[in-house]
């Protein structure tokens, strides 16, 4: 019985170690040399969300209202590292574990002139709890994570409008 309990505890610890979030990756890498890091807190999102409309223009000059999504965000984490650094190698391995450990779905991948961009989401059919954007261009590796409780339909509509 003691062996079974020990085995179960070890399995739980192993699963927890691989189930990192954008916040945990940010905390792990943001203070390392050669890492550029940006964090936006829930308080900042609440403050921005009180503005009447937060708009951006798409390529056709049409306004896209971001307020419905901003109000649902709980964190923004960005890490940018030189792709040839040891931090980049380690970060890429941790991002791979994150994407493999949760049920992330690849929304799109774009490759152009040596640059690769991938966008992933995690959540259920109605809500998105995490949106991750990864970019590699041969010089830098960029990891961006938006976390919150985003309505999937609203997010997809905003992404479609912004992509026009």
Please state what every model-predicted region is.
Residues 69-115:
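Mid-length scaffold segments of soluble, non-membrane domains
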